[in-house]
Amino acid sequence: MAMKKLLIASLLFSSATVYGAEGFVVKDIHFEGLQRVAVGAALLSMPVRPGDTVTDDDISNTIRALFATGNFEDVRVLRDGDTLLVQVKERPTIASITFSGNKSVKDDMLKQNLEASGVRVGESLDRTTIADIEKGLEDFYYSVGKYSASVKAVVTPLPRNRVDLKLVFQEGVSAKIQQINIVGNHAFSTDELISHFQLRDEVPWWNVVGDRKYQKQKLAGDLETLRSYYLDRGYARFNIDSTQVSLTPDKKGIYITVNITEGDQYKFSGVQVTGNLAGHSAEIEALTKVEPGELYNGAKVTRMENDIKKLLGRYGYAYPRVQSQPEINDSDKTVKLHVNVDAGNRYYVRKIRFEGNDTSKDAVLRREMRQMEGAWLGSDLVDQGKDRLNRLGFFETVDTDTQRVPGSPDQVDVVYKVKERNTGSFNFGIGYGTESGVSFQAGVQQDNWLGTGYAVGINGTKNDYQTYTELSVTNPYFTVDGVSLGGRVFYNDFDANDADLSDYTNKSYGTDITLGFPVNEYNTLRAGVGYVHNSLSNMQPQVAMWRYLNSMGQYPDNTNDRNSFSANDFTFNYGWTYNKLDRGFFPTEGSRVNLNGKVTIPGSDNEYYKATLDTATYVPIDNDHQWVVLGRTRFGYGDGIGGKEMPFYENFYAGGSSTVRGFQSNTIGPKAVYFPASSRHDDDDSYDNECKSTESAPCKSDDAVGGNAMAVASLELITPTPFISDKYANSVRTSVFWDMGTVWDTHWDSSAYAGYPDYSDPSNIRMSAGIAVQWMSPLGPLVFSYAQPFKKYDGDKAEQFQFNIGKTW
């Protein structure tokens, strides 16, 4: 025992004293202090084995090897005769990890970072690693301007050499920028330069992008913006000399000073293109032309490089290298641009694969492809395929990945990665207004039936005034060339009086068939035929209605409120669609134009034509497409042929969630003017117009009758949805809007009805403004809107809150 103490004391001064220069032969190895680590595992990590001759260097290597396992806080190696005694203190095992006070950083993100550093439940606690994590987290807070933040690791011992690890955060407040100074600017004012920054020392109320909270990453981005601003205006020698960020003593304020050297403005003297141009020199040189005396422009140089890469990509050169080097001549203030191009190998497509299409059949996606297998890779064709998949509306996201084929110098696989969305919707609508009360509608639509791409819909409405049923089917690829075939059958029993419209009842049924012919990538023409039977009854004597009947050779008695009429019509239906939206669901860029019309053909009782034109344009105002301006219009017009009028039941209506929000559906526009009917009883509650049997002159009502002309427009700002995580960002859309619209009757004779509103005047425009939220829920698209009408006319019916399932735009 005395010998062991002597050896321990000697170890503290010199290991050489213990083992000697020549070492000794180890006959046995004993461990002290092992709890969780097995003896066998500890022995395997040591470079020394029984029977080895051990020197001082071997002992040092043994200690290092044991520390390297990460299992021990302390290691001592002692000699007891011919036995090597290894004394260890194991690191405690982490039993639990908790967080407190963290608001800016979520628990899941913290756990991921800890696990990446090897800190997880069940592992040994490395205090050095914990200290590094503390510092790293504090550095993160400093980078986002929270200089008073602190992160402390609290380690609580538990039985059996275990510990609880708790990270306690004190995030503090973000330091706000007090002032931004730019020193050395002469050509542009400081205010002009700072106006392009994200970080600002003053943020007007209307600026939704500017931020006074300091962030290191944003400052780096702003400095790059400053550099680009000068380079794009000819300052080829522009330089940022230094940047100082000063913190106030209370760590709540930031002063930023940027020192710059503007230099002089330079002009292009020419562009020289060299290298492997793959036989496309003429096209590449056309992309690099500059005008004589044109100012040097850094953005144009970058655009040249990207355009050359895109050009070569269209011809199969998937990985070209394009480098530009400016040659600056300070004597005449010119820049000669040298562009070196290496087209590289030409690649061919071996396979096109799809991932994520669990429901949609492979053929549904493959028929949208413009890139062919076996052909050379065309980047524009790959992008067209992506755009076409997006426009289907079946997917939340579509991404492409071009993967080189191992072992092949000139082959790639093109992979389309899709995330499917619910293409079926249960269409259920509710509206509430002070005059209208509650209204309902319902239906089922499946745009990708059983993954085949067929659109199948069954829609129905059942309420106090309507029973409607419709079955529709569309095959978008009736032929291999992309000709579509669609058809529908419907039945409608409609009581207009109970719907607050002009008083009549119409029972109708019909069918139609339509073929769609793709003209090119973005244009489609449609043509088809249809049949409809209308059986009208209980028609009250109303001016516009009687005017139509007279044009049809029917001259009913003005005093009879039980008139009836029926018509069978055959129509030629036509249409045109231009669609260049970036995706079919929640688009953010591009435009869509939709023209639909019909005209009766020989054999019809009616003779008329009718057409509607819908447009929508999306313009992103930021690079991430989070802020988007949407403009929508809808125009409609119809009229009779050969002296006849368009049927009143084909009139246009406005108001409601798809036209002018804030107004009850179909209530904007002309109102019914009734003739007095002596056969109607004054106590008949089925009619609510103001005429009484004792009156002799026509009288107005609040019943909407629609018109043969319509114009609707909407301006909308789509914004990021607050309080929504990134997981649901693609499923929810928020916007503020301004709607306007009107409906008028071009045949209304204002001179004959001088005491009544002029329903032929198209300037009677209604307006509303509000907010809307759309959500692609498991049931289908949900649309909530709240709008306040601020321009309306007598007889209009407000409906501020509207809620629909199954309608998005």
Swiss-Prot record:
Q: Which InterPro entries match?
A: Bac_surfAg_D15, BamA/TamA_POTRA, D15-like, OM_assembly_BamA, POTRA
Which residues fall in a coiled-coil region?
none
Give the multimer and partner information: Part of the Bam complex, which is composed of the outer membrane protein BamA, and four lipoproteins BamB, BamC, BamD and BamE.
What Gene3D superfamilies does this protein map onto? membrane protein fhac, membrane protein fhac: a member of the omp85/tpsb transporter family
Q: Where is the composition biased (Basic and acidic residues)?
A: 679-693
Please indicate if the UniProt record lists Lyase as a keyword. no
UniProt-recorded name of the protein: Outer membrane protein assembly factor BamA
Q: Where is this region: Disordered?
A: 679-698
Q: Which PANTHER family match?
A: OUTER MEMBRANE PROTEIN ASSEMBLY FACTOR BAMA, SORTING AND ASSEMBLY MACHINERY SAMM50 PROTEIN FAMILY MEMBER
Query: Its function?
Result: Part of the outer membrane protein assembly complex, which is involved in assembly and insertion of beta-barrel proteins into the outer membrane. Constitutes, with BamD, the core component of the assembly machinery.
